[in-house]
Amino acid sequence: MFGFSFRQRKPSSAQTAKERLQILLAHERSSGGSNPDFLPLLQRDILEVVRRHMEIDSDAVDVKLERSDDLSSLEINIELPYAKQLKRA
């Protein structure tokens, strides 16, 4: 009768991507922030996750990391296919 409330849900792809991003950022912080080698790997992983749900070009994902003395900012831009169609209309 109550068996349904004890089932574990499979994490969504968004949750999995969020967890991976948190791990990457924690690793980047612990390395002193001097190693931007994770950015191409992050870009590839994001592209793979988005491609599971829609068809996008390889250059559709842009990842930028900006740093100041007390703040790091990660910007991720993904150009979605329907955005291209809207521009043409």
Swiss-Prot record:
GO biological process: cell division; regulation of division septum assembly
Functional note: Prevents the cell division inhibition by proteins MinC and MinD at internal division sites while permitting inhibition at polar sites. This ensures cell division at the proper site by restricting the formation of a division septum at the midpoint of the long axis of the cell.
Family listed: Belongs to the MinE family.
Gene that specifies this protein: minE
Disulfide-bonded cysteines: none
Key words of the record: Cell cycle, Cell division, Plasmid
Cited Gene3D superfamilies: Cell division topological specificity factor MinE (3.30.1070.10)
Protein's UniProt keywords contain Cell cycle: yes
Highest classification ranks of the organism: Bacteria, Pseudomonadati, Pseudomonadota, Alphaproteobacteria, Rhodobacterales
Domain of life the protein comes from: Bacteria
Record field: transmembrane: none
Pfam families attached to this UniProt entry: MinE (PF03776)
Protein name: Cell division topological specificity factor
